[in-house]
């Protein structure tokens, strides 16, 4: 099985060390463009663009990277409760059309009550997943070309439709990650690829089996992906030294503040990440070559695969054997590490190198009439 390898655009900051200004670097459009173009040339399938108040807007960043890349895909967040599904469907179709079919979408429900309140969202965990399920139903149906009437608990639309369809059919793939039961049920019923954070293989296997069984109950099959950091060097010793350097400027106060911030979220996945290290620096290798040091101060994906190319490739293949075909990777700093992963790791894997998409012909059309329909040429009999 060929593997889809993704990289990451660090729109929330970048540097050589975690939890300090030491070794940090400015992240501007030029720097993000360097990373995107490196990923494009090295054969990554795409890049994940993060979302949240600590990040630049993912949609605007993705749109700005389309003209400077050729085959790279952009995995961009959909935010139920923050955005209406009809607006999100129009945005998704436009991004897919402008990128010539290089748009992917990541459903993000949110987990920090404080940040959500700042966005005007006051739903609890269960309610957010109810709203996300309704959002996804409407979003998918619009991209499938339906005219949608929907009267849900959280979302109400009447006569919603999409005049400009996406390039990818039936619609651009939808990714999603969540560890709670309601999250897994949403994934099983509606998404195309389920993402998990980088837990030890036995825990990932358990989660995949749960989601796969729930999908089968809906008569569906879905794909699986994993989100990991990577520290790869020419030797294992060099890789572990690099891992230690990454947290060499961390103090206990910074770790405690970060863990307190993570604790206020209601994310089951974040709780599982925190349990891998319990905020302590000792015994961070939680599984062979799987290191939890990143999660001491970084929310979300908090583990890294550490080693030389063959060693890290062996660990990746262990995850692939569980049914994972997509790996969303990152490393600090992201420009240099994109090259290290491409040069030291990719040669030891069966990497699916994406082709440059050919321009897709669009149907001739006139100007939309009264914001309701588009006149099209009628075939002569």
From Swiss-Prot:
It catalyses: an alkanesulfonate + FMNH2 + O2 = an aldehyde + FMN + sulfite + H2O + 2 H(+). Pfam families: Bac_luciferase. Keywords: Flavoprotein, FMN, Monooxygenase, Oxidoreductase. The keyword Flavoprotein applies. GO terms for biological process: alkanesulfonate catabolic process. GO terms for molecular function: alkanesulfonate monooxygenase activity. SUPFAM superfamilies: Bacterial luciferase-like (SSF51679). Its EC number is 1.14.14.5. FMNH(2) which is absolutely required for this enzymatic reaction, is provided by SsuE. Catalyzes the desulfonation of aliphatic sulfonates. NCBIfam families: alk_sulf_monoox, PRK00719.1. Homotetramer. Belongs to the SsuD family. This is Alkanesulfonate monooxygenase. The lineage of its organism: Bacteria, Pseudomonadati, Pseudomonadota, Gammaproteobacteria, Enterobacterales.
